Design a protein with these regions (language model features):
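Flexible, non-catalytic linker and terminal segments flanking ANL/adenylate-forming cores
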Residues: 1-49
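AMP-dependent adenylate-forming
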Residues: 29-36, 53-77
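Conserved AMP-binding/adenylate-forming core of the ANL superfamily
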Residues: 46, 65-110, 114-118, 135-140, ...
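Short acidic/polar active-site loop segments enriched in Thr and Asp
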Residues: 98, 149, 171
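Structural motif
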Residues: 104, 150-154, 174
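Short beta-strand elements of ligand-binding domains
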Residues: 107, 130-131, 171-176
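Structured binding elements
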Residues: 124
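Conserved ATP-dependent adenylate/AMP-binding module captured primarily in the ANL superfamily
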Residues: 132-168
């Protein structure tokens, strides 16, 4: 067989399409399919080295009197939002939650769920969110897979939680 050289028809400064330039693994965290919607600048921009709690607080220090969200007539300012996050973070710490702990939250996206996510991020814990409509077996599998030690659950999910909690490493359940 004769040796040969392959020449590309693309100019040397042209980059290949990100979608076609690598093999698809099937893992979103590796394949990053969302990048196809990003500009090159946005896709390669370095992320800030801070928690999303700190990022949100730093980027809204001049917006403290503006509304952060409205939910069924309930409005709150950034100042009150960050105060609620701080109180929730202190409460989690008082319960024994510490940096690196995984806290599962089985609740829809209520304002309280958002506050809990930010509070856990503030203290360095990891929020693992589960849809409360998930069946008991899947909740059990998820709790065991991530080795969650704490569980916050919507009260209507308690019957499901109660049926599986002894099969997990969860040491504290809080129903709201």
């Amino acid at each position: 067989m004769k040796d040969f050289t392959i020449y590309s028809a693309l100019p040397s400064d042209m980059k290949l399409d990100r979608e076609r330039s690598k093999e698809i693994t099937g893992y979103a965290s590796i394949d990053k399919p969302w990048l196809k919607y990003y500009t090159e600048e946005a896709a390669t921009k370095e992320l800030p080295k801070k928690t999303f709690y700190r990022y949100a607080k730093d980027n809204n220090k001049y917006n403290m009197e503006m509304n952060v969200f409205r939910y069924y007539g309930f409005k709150t300012t950034y100042r009150k939002f960050f105060d609620m996050i701080d109180k929730a973070a202190n409460s989690f710490a008082a319960l024994g939650v510490k940096k690196g702990d995984i806290v599962t939250i089985c609740s829809p996206t209520f304002p309280e769920t958002i506050i809990a996510n930010y509070a856990l991020n503030k203290i360095g814990a990891v929020a693992n969110n589960i849809d409360p409509r998930t069946n008991a077996k899947r909740i059990e599998e998820n709790l065991n897979k991530v080795n969650s030690k704490y569980l916050i659950a919507l009260d209507i999910a308690f019957p499901k939680i109660n049926s599986i909690i002894r099969n997990t490493n969860v040491k504290m359940v809080v129903c709201n």
